[in-house]
Amino acid sequence: DANGSEQGKVRPVVVIQNNRGNKYSPTTIVACLSSKVYSKHHLPTHYLLPEGLGLKYKSMVMCEQIRVLDKSRLIKKITKLDKRHMMHIDRRIKISLDLKQQHLHSRK
């Protein structure tokens, strides 16, 4: 169930979890998409995907709307985004989560 500004209903998502996690975990991490690109406030956490990527409409990746989903909830693969799009999305995820280089540390 969605409350307030949370995204509800069946919608496309971008899988943002790394490939190793996707291979071994029963869950995956996703960012929600919205086709209401003109009604959305353009936040620094938003990335506009152009038409022609297998989506019906231009869509906004909302990197502040990150979810963990059981893989069984994924209906079908629509497309694979190239590295350029994923770099833009990665940058916005870092903004959303306030991940700065000085905050990242290795664990033993």
What function would you assign to each model-found segment?
Residues 52-108:
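C-terminal terminal-subdomain/extension
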